[in-house]
């Protein structure tokens, strides 16, 4: 299984000789245990705002201080990152999803990634690079991972098989400098001893028997069709001029903004009455007590006909409430 993880990571330039590899029960376990190994109570952790709720909650568990940096159309605002580091030079860790970010679907440019690494070097910052969606690009060219450009052993890379094979498999991995991952490996043993062998064997046999690259390419084409289907439906059914959204080059998310309102929750509640679930922006925020006029859509699981129907129902709600 480790060989499979290394093979996938090498394609992203995310494995170096001397790196340690730990197989995880889902990439989120890797983030949680890595955070547990690194974070002490009161530490300052820099995260994108908004960011993945699972990771934010993992960090909160360890009673750290979360410092949010806004996400722009081309990824994290590196000017704000620099300001945050100047104000908090003792920050210990940066957590980022640079490719097809959750929830915004945005991708950090190569220039910004280089700047992130420069700032990490200047302020002696560790980085967790969470890359579960990197294989799901359906437009444009790949952007080099932070790990592939790291020359100072600062980046801990978290990858996933769940997103390319089956979400229910809960199979991921962490790659990083051996000295950084020693404690993570111990915590993994305490947590669940090891990732279920049956799941690992299924993944290994699949990758031996089939061409994983062709399988991923098939999924990319499907996600591209579903993404376009969702965008087409939004253009048809959403109120004109009252909803803005990202257009991702990959991944599984669309991020929507309703600039004419302050709080999306009435829309969320009304949509649920029509059996349409959307995730409010508050769920991904550093301060979840503040209202948000944003919401996330996911096009990965539903059929194209269901996507169209769901967006139509959501459009009815938006036309009523906006």
PLM ranges: what are they?
Residues 62, 122-123, 153, 274, ...:
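Helix C-cap/helix->beta junction micro-motif
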Residues 273, 289-322:
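PLP-dependent enzyme catalytic core of the Aspartate aminotransferase-like
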Residues 1-123, 128, 134-136, 141-149, ...:
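Conserved core of the PLP fold type I
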Residues 151-221:
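Conserved core segment of the aminotransferase class I/II
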Residues 177-178, 208, 257-259, 300-302:
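Residue-level recognition of strand-loop junctions within catalytic nucleotide-signaling folds
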Residues 204, 220-231, 243-257, 267-269:
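Conserved glycine-rich beta-strand-loop-beta hairpin in the small C-terminal domain of fold type I
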């Amino acid at each position: 299984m480790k060989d499979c993880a290394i093979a996938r990571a090498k394609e992203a330039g995310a494995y170096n000789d001397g790196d340690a590899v730990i197989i995880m029960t889902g990439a989120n376990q890797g983030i949680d245990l890595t955070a547990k190994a690194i974070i002490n109570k009161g530490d300052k952790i820099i995260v994108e705002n908004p960011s993945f709720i699972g990771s934010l909650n993992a960090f909160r568990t360890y009673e750290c201080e979360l410092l949010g940096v806004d996400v722009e159309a081309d990824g994290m605002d590196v000017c704000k990152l620099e300001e945050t580091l100047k104000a908090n030079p003792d920050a210990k860790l940066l957590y980022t999803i640079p490719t097809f970010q959750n929830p915004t679907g945005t991708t950090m440019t190569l220039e910004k990634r280089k700047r992130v690494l420069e700032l990490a070097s200047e302020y002696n910052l560790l980085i967790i690079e969470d890359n579960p969606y990197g294989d799901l690009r359906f437009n444009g060219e790949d952007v080099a991972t932070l790990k592939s450009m790291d020359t100072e052993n600062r980046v801990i890379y978290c990858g996933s098989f769940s997103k390319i094979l089956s979400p229910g498999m809960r199979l991921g991995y962490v790659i990083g400098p051996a000295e950084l991952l020693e404690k993570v490996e111990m915590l993994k043993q305490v947590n669940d001893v090891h990732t279920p062998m049956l799941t690992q064997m299924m993944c290994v046999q699949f990758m031996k028997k089939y061409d994983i690259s062709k399988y991923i390419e098939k999924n990319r084409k499907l996600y591209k069709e579903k993404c376009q289907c969702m965008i087409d439906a939004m253009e048809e059914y959403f109120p004109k001029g009252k909803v803005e959204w990202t257009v991702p080059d990959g991944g599984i998310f669309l991020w929507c903004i309703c600039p004419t309102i302050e709080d999306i929750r009435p829309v969320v509640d009304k949509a649920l009455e029509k059996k349409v679930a959307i995730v409010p922006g508050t769920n991904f925020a550093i301060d979840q007590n503040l209202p948000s006029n944003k919401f996330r859509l996911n096009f990965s699981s539903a059929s194209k006909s269901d996507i169209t129907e769901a967006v139509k129902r959501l459009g009815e709600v938006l036309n009523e409430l906006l």
